[in-house]
């Protein structure tokens, strides 16, 4: 149950689990857009399973429901393809069903935006004095980063949610 762990499943493949993990990593690393789904992408170098080992759609759905990312043989019969890239995160810390970090694209998008924000703040405010004007300048930079992410179609509805973006001094660590 981890938003940063992916468990791929391809029944009957003669390829080693480590090769399947490596192929998945190659596909994820080669995709520049963190928000673009990886569904149907081929896993290079993975041997296809025998037809008797192919998974049924109901088995794939069960795997997905339980935080396992199934792989299937493509229509051409020669390539292993991602069904849906998900993490093992299926329940929150209090034990209730939670899909918030299930899709790999969600986690990759969060990481991308977080790094973009961190890099911008480090670039614009490397040795900034903390005063009452700083918070508004930081907020302005954050809005710019978020709007650029929306232009790249990584985020949606940024302007509609700007009222929820709070930048304030920490009263316990002024």
Residue ranges and their predicted role:
Residues 14, 28-174:
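Structured, hydrophobic secondary-structure cores that serve as assembly/anchoring elements
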């Amino acid at each position: 149950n981890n938003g940063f762990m992916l468990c791929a499943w391809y029944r009957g493949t003669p390829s080693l689990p480590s090769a399947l993990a490596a192929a998945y990593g190659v596909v994820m690393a080669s995709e520049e857009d963190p928000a673009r789904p990886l569904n149907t992408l081929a896993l290079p170098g993975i041997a296809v399973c025998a037809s008797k080992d192919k998974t049924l759609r109901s088995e794939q759905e069960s795997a997905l429901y339980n935080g396992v990312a199934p792989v299937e043989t493509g229509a051409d019969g020669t390539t292993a393809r991602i069904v849906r890239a998900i993490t093992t995160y299926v329940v929150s810390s209090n034990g209730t069903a939670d899909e918030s970090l299930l899709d790999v694209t969600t986690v990759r998008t969060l990481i991308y935006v977080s790094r973009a924000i961190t890099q911008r703040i480090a670039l614009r405010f490397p040795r900034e004095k903390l005063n009452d004007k700083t918070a508004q300048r930081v907020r302005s930079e954050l809005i710019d980063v978020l709007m650029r992410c929306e232009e790249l179609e990584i985020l949606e509805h940024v302007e509609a949610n700007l009222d929820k973006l709070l930048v304030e001094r920490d009263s316990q660590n002024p």
